[in-house]
Amino acid sequence: MLKSLDVGFNFAAVKPESGPRRRWCIFTSAGDQNAIHLWLQGNTQHQWDLVVAYYGDDSKEFSELAKVSSYAFRTKGGKFQILKKLVTEKPKFFDQYSHVWVCDDDIKMSAAQIDEAFAIAEFYEFWVAQPAFSPRSKISHLINEYAGSHCDYRLVNFVEENTPIFFREKLIQFLDVYDGSLTGHGNDWWYLNFFKANELGHLRNFRKTNELGRFAIIDRIQVINPHDVEKGQREIDRLQPLAERYARWVEVMIKNGLVVFPQMIFASCKISSHRIPGVPVTRFDVARRIASSPIRKLVRKYKKLSADWRKKRKATAVAGRIAQ
């Protein structure tokens, strides 16, 4: 018996519910230039379900995607817009999963890479994580580029919206406040503001080192984010032109009091052989990052000058009283 997935969009036929229950899920909104076939290559049985929202107009392409998906349906919109509608209509849809990877459909990666990225994100209990981008990739934010073999993952305050792996409970929390107004640009800043990533690394949070383990870029996994020239016209531009996406983001940012903030790396970490759970970040890591900031240096210098001035003023007052 086939289960139907009706979320208020077009009807979708999907695979039977038989088979192992998986704890991980990839969700993507796919067009006709997707790279999903790469995700499924190899003889090993992957450990995740694939949920595809197809926004193209080719019935044959949709049929092929439905064959390889756990769930597939047809609709228009961006990933997070569709997710919002899906979870609104089916609140328990993702309940069986520990992590949900909200991934662009054109990311080039293998099934083995996907399995390992999920395993690392789950093991270290990251709220949101992403794989690093190969140097061959389109790099929109320098922090996302592969850092080198000296680290397996970096603890950061920024995870881009094209490949975020969410701890499922955190994704649902964000979707509760997300109104579906953004097609693409700005979704990452929205969920990072919601999770208070913009407050990490501040001097006032010096003692809260445990909070620095919430977001990560996994350098052990390098994927390819293809350049625009490889894809031709970006399919998201057909949904909404870039200028309109940016203008809408500015409106949302003002309405919700969101901020764009400097991207920071708090620690570069290796995965130890004994694999002790938890994130090895110390206050020294925080202090080093804070001290390296030019603004922090100026503040520290100002405080030192102020303290010296107060000491001199006090000494002058004491000398005056003695002279009297």
Where are these predicted regions, by residue range?
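C-terminal catalytic/acceptor-binding lobe
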Residues: 1-12, 181-324
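N-proximal low-complexity "stem/linker" segments adjacent to membrane-targeting elements
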Residues: 1-67
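Active-site-proximal specificity loops/subdomain of glycosyltransferases
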Residues: 52-98
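Short, high-confidence coil segments that cap the C-terminus of an alpha-helix
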Residues: 97, 124-126, 213
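Intrinsically disordered, low-complexity, charge-dense segments enriched in Lys/Arg
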Residues: 32-39, 167-168, 235-237, 256
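Short, hinge-like loop/turn segments at secondary-structure boundaries
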Residues: 68-69, 145-149, 233-236
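Short beta-strand-to-loop acidic/aromatic patch adjacent to the donor-nucleotide binding site
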Residues: 95-108
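Conserved catalytic core of nucleotide-sugar-dependent glycosyltransferases
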Residues: 109-197
